[in-house]
Every structure is written in structure tokens, then in C-alpha cells.
Regions:
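Non-catalytic alpha-helical scaffolds and adjoining flexible linkers that form interface surfaces
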Residues: 1-21, 26-234
Length: 234
């Protein structure tokens, strides 16, 4: 029997049978994989927390038939600081949804995994405003990493289908406020320093625009509104 070992983050879980659970893990070396955890729901509480959502661990597993079976798990970080802070949990929940939508099973995305791991630790240390801007920069990186680029030839409208910010108005474009254009046009230049970043509402507007862009071009279903419990208007 060949055992496989990798670091990974639990991004989804589904109870299965009387005591089993299937966990979806975004792994460093193998992309997104589903692991069958036998008898975990009948095990002691500590073991259950090791396969809970948003737990970073080293996983050892093997393949049996069409399934990957978890053999051992060594927790690295439970991210309690994220789970116990509602605003940080909102942002983290959205990150998990991005992973679930963007990454296909078995698709190896080591650099993306490393960015996600850094992002989770970044969220712990920073305020909501800076964290929203970090999400925006991550989405910009995703767009570029998937081979797309938003061309800027104006500043009044965002044309999702044409991947451009333009001054030409038609039925396909989205009007841009001046503050929103400033964020979108300088996203790669701005550092993550809170006193240089726009207010939260503008950042959310920018994220939603990127979300619409990614959903259109990558056929995903990102939806920030589902993850905001704090009552932000968007």
C-alpha cells in the first residue's frame, strides 16, 4: 500500500454514513482532494477538530478503489483567532469559497496554496479594511494567473466582456465612481498600508466588480454577499 503525504487546508466537510466524514482538502502538492475519514464522528473531540473546517494539517492518505482514505493527520494550525472573530471569519469564509470555485479536483496550484496560507496569517494580524484590500489584490492575481488582463483606456466604465476600463458607454458597461476607478487602476501599485486604502464600502464595490469579472470569464459563482454577516451594504 502506497501512502501519500501532503500539507493541506480543510475547506469543506460532509458527514457520510453512521460515523464517517468526507473532507475536501486544498493541498500543497495535489490541489483539491476529497479524503474519506473513517469513524471520525465516533472518535474523541480532539480528533474531530483536526478534520474540521479551516484546519491546516499534514495529511497521510492512500488510495483504495476510487477513494482516497485518510490514514493519519498531524494538525499544524486550527486558526482559532479567525474562527472566533466574526469580521475575520467573514473574509476567511469568502477565501474558502474562492478556493472551492477556482480550483478543480487534482489541479496542482502550489503557489496559490502558499498564498492562501500566508493570507490566513495576514488576516489574523490586520484590520478589516486592510484585509478587504488583500482580498482584492488576491483576486487581481487570480485574474492574471488565469491569463486575463484588464486594459485601461479610460476611467468611466468597466466593460467585463471586453476586459477593459473605458470611456465608451453602451448597454454592457458598469459605471465607475471616481474612487472606485482609483482603486482599480492602482491596485498593483498600492501597498497594504491602512492609511493609503479607500474606505470599506469602496473596497467591497471593487471586490464585487472583480467577482463579476471572474464569474463571467471563469464560469464561477463567487458571491461576497453570502459571506458578510456584519451588515455592510453591497
Amino acid at each position: 500500500m502506497k501512502f501519500i503525504r501532503t500539507k493541506g487546508l480543510v475547506i469543506k466537510k460532509v458527514d457520510f454514513g453512521e460515523g464517517d466524514r468526507i473532507i475536501t482538502v486544498f493541498s500543497e502538492n495535489f490541489g483539491k482532494i476529497d479524503l474519506l475519514v473513517k469513524g471520525i464522528r465516533k472518535s474523541k473531540k480532539r480528533d474531530q477538530s483536526s478534520v474540521d473546517l479551516l484546519t491546516l494539517s499534514n495529511f497521510t492518505f492512500y488510495k483504495k478503489g476510487d477513494n482516497f482514505i485518510l490514514n493519519t493527520i498531524d494538525p499544524i494550525d486550527f486558526f482559532y483567532d479567525l474562527k472566533n472573530d466574526i469580521e475575520k471569519l467573514e473574509i476567511t469564509s469568502y477565501i474558502l469559497s474562492i478556493i472551492n470555485e477556482i480550483i478543480f479536483p487534482g489541479e496542482r496550484k502550489k503557489e496559490f496554496f502558499q498564498r492562501i496560507e500566508k493570507a490566513l496569517n495576514f488576516i489574523i494580524k490586520n484590520n478589516t479594511q486592510v484585509n478587504f484590500f488583500m482580498i482584492l489584490k488576491m483576486m487581481n492575481w487570480i485574474v492574471k494567473n488565469e491569463g486575463y488582463r484588464i486594459n485601461i483606456s479610460g476611467e468611466k466604465y468597466f466593460n467585463i466582456a471586453e476586459s477593459s476600463i473605458t470611456d465608451f458607454d453602451d448597454e454592457k458597461v458598469i459605471p465607475l465612481k471616481k474612487e472606485l476607478f482609483e482603486i482599480l487602476s492602482n491596485i498593483e501599485k498600492k501597498a497594504l498600508i491602512s492609511n493609503e486604502i479607500a474606505n470599506i464600502e469602496i473596497l467591497i464595490d471593487a471586490i464585487i466588480l472583480y467577482e463579476k469579472y471572474i464569474n463571467y470569464h471563469l464560469d464561477t459563482k463567487l458571491n461576497l454577499k453570502k459571506h458578510l454577516f456584519g451588515g455592510y451594504s453591497c
